[in-house]
Structures are given as C-alpha cells and as structure tokens.
C-alpha cells in the first residue's frame, strides 16, 4: 500500500472516529464517512472490503483509547500493592468512558457489527480484559482468598462477571434508568457495590 493509500485509509478511520463521537453509532454509514472524507462513495471499499471491516477499524481506535486511559489511570491512581484500589480506578475509567464517549462505547461492544479477526481488533481488545483478570486475581490474593472463591470460579470467570456488571451499570446509567431507580447522581456507590459483590467487602 502506497503512502497516499495509507494516508487515505487512516483518514477514513479518523472521520469515522469523529463522526461516532459527534453523532453516534447510527451515523456511521459508508456513504457519510466517504462524504466527510472528501472521497467518492465507492472509495472506502478499496481499503475496507465491507462496512463491518471499516467499523472494526474505528472500534479498534476506541479500544486503544480506553486501554491507554485505563493503563495510565491505574498506574497513577493506586499503589501496585493495593489491587482493590486499582480496580476501583479501572472501573471508574470504564464507566467514565461509557458516559463521555457513548457512541464509541456502543460500537466497541456491538459484535454483530464487527469482525473480531479484522485489522487486529481482537488483539487490541483482549489486553484490556487481561488487565481486569490480573487485577481481580491480585485483589483476591491480597484479601487472602485462594485461586478459587467459594463458588469455584476462577479469576477469569469472576472478572467476566464483574465486567458484565460494569457494562450493565454503564448502559443503565447512560439510559438514565439507574438514576431514576436509585435517586442518586453518583455512579461511585454502584461501582463499590459491584466490587463488593464479586470480590467481597474490602478488608482495609
């Protein structure tokens, strides 16, 4: 691929990232992305054989952004010897991303619209989950738990359940349902309750 082709391909992804941020997932048509990039309607097909492949490239940017934010915040937000505090930071970054980057967040987890093997999307998204698994494992070890909890679940399963809980909080908070149900305007207590539910109450 020539330098010009590489530049145009990146431009199409850049436009998609900008578009989903401003107008949401529903705005990401090939035609609209091409129009805003200043190319013909058929030009994106030269670099992305399907609409899904272009959406996957856009979603990859989202995972890269979220991973960078989480890594930086976890490193700065809590001592390594306190993985529970780091999990709290991780959860806040995740929920903040879902709130401030709603369109991108929705795209990232719409696997019916994405091709996981396309353009390294799987390789970009999985490290974030591995970070969560590592933090969960260390938090359980730090609290004196064995490699298995009372339910027989491994850290990877506990992390999966916690992720599902965080995702549910993010979605319901974004829709306004949790604010209505709880009467609260701070997601922090919900995050702490989720951590306690999956890891047990904090002991220190």
Q: What spans do the regions from the language model cover?
A:
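Short hydrophobic/aromatic patch on the recognition helix
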Residues: 38-48
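N-terminal intrinsically disordered/low-complexity leader segments
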Residues: 1-7, 203-204
């Amino acid at each position: 691929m020539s330098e010009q082709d590489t530049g145009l391909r990146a431009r199409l992804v850049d436009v998609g990232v900008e578009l989903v941020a401003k107008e949401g997932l529903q705005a990401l048509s090939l035609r609209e992305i091409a129009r805003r990039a200043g190319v013909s309607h058929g030009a994106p097909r030269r670099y992305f054989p399907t609409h899904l492949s272009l959406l996957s490239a856009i979603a990859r940017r989202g995972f890269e952004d979220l991973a960078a934010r989480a890594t930086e915040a976890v490193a700065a937000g809590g001592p390594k010897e306190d993985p529970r505090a780091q999990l709290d930071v991780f959860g806040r970054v995740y929920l903040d991303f879902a709130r401030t980057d709603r369109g991108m967040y929705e795209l990232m987890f719409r696997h019916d619209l994405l091709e996981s093997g396309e353009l390294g999307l799987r390789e970009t998204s999985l490290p974030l989950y591995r970070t969560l698994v590592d933090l969960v494992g260390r938090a359980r070890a730090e609290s004196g738990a064995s490699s298995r909890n009372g339910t027989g679940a491994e850290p990877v399963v506990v992390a999966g359940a916690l992720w599902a809980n965080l995702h549910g909080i993010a979605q319901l908070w974004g829709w306004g349902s949790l604010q209505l149900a709880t009467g609260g305007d701070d997601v922090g207590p919900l995050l702490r309750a989720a951590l306690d539910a999956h890891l047990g109450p904090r002991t220190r």
